């Protein structure tokens, strides 16, 4: 990990947590691993701790105990979590484990029997109880004032906003429903209240996340069956779009009702960005069937065409798995051909690997490692070519960008087509004096590479 647990993983957050403890105030450290959804869990825990009088330590040695929020999605992530726990134990000695890997307490205590407690994902109260047992709180209501938006581990100008927990799908390669349970959507009033506090605190971009964002609210038993209330994500998106910030949707399944979001994205007068992050995973129907995925590749091409017809500037991001058990060369070639036709804007790819507890482990005809690597290389070569062509087409255009960071070499920015950390950047290397993170500025694009753009202020 790092010597500074609150910095988290560099691919998720770069904001430094200040050491602002008063004399005698108990201090807790936090190490957060995994996806943005786990990051939001860490933020909630830290917010609760601050409300109860704890300070957040910027290092192991200054903390009286350390919380490690783990990831258990892949075997490699489990090993990383065990290493982070071991590092925290060696550096501090008092460690509380939570998160997805906490659903397997014996796995953790077998490797690290001296941890103080192990709790599962979203078990905030249990985490707080463990902290109380290790380090009693010392609240001072006249001093311990929280910022209205809570404690955030991302830069101040953007924030992840989790709208639901759990997932009702049963994809064979995924164990998240086993760890996080069935879909449980947050009340829209609670989501909007948090969103308003974030925007009021200076957040310029809200990144909407859950396991299945487009299914938001379908678990509500008393919802109406007509209009926006049939699919509450439509009403929520409409309300979020009025707050004056960029609103970016992640983890969206290509359900038919998603098409109803597109006119809202096409309207430049509101904040819902023309951007969809959709995990298609594959394109061959037989592979999708073996994955138990709730989508068909032929229909998704029709949906993509409809989205682009109604919103020509929409950005489509997706991730795929190559080397899934039973994947033949012909099935993989179908995926490559599908990419040629779909022409997605942002494309990621993973090589399949077994995950303890996943049903896909028992499938026949696992693909050899060297074949998976070859297919990944060929996939990424095509994805890179598509990306480069799309970015070259943007040279000469004028667009609004959000400034993420500024140093002596220039400003690193993002367009509406770029989510933080996972997509590309737009760099300004001239005339950037006076820019600060969170600024929204207009640039003219004058250069492009495979994944990034360069531009100048207009």
Swiss-Prot record:
The keyword Nucleotidyltransferase does not apply. It comes from Jannaschia sp. (strain CCS1). Binds 2 [4Fe-4S] clusters. One cluster is coordinated with 3 cysteines and an exchangeable S-adenosyl-L-methionine. Its cofactor is [4Fe-4S] cluster. Catalyzes the methylthiolation of an aspartic acid residue of ribosomal protein uS12. Keywords: 4Fe-4S, Cytoplasm, Iron, Iron-sulfur, Metal-binding, S-adenosyl-L-methionine, Transferase. Disulfide bonds: none annotated. The gene is rimO. Residues 153-389 form the Radical SAM core domain. Residues 392-458 form the TRAM domain. This is Ribosomal protein uS12 methylthiotransferase RimO.
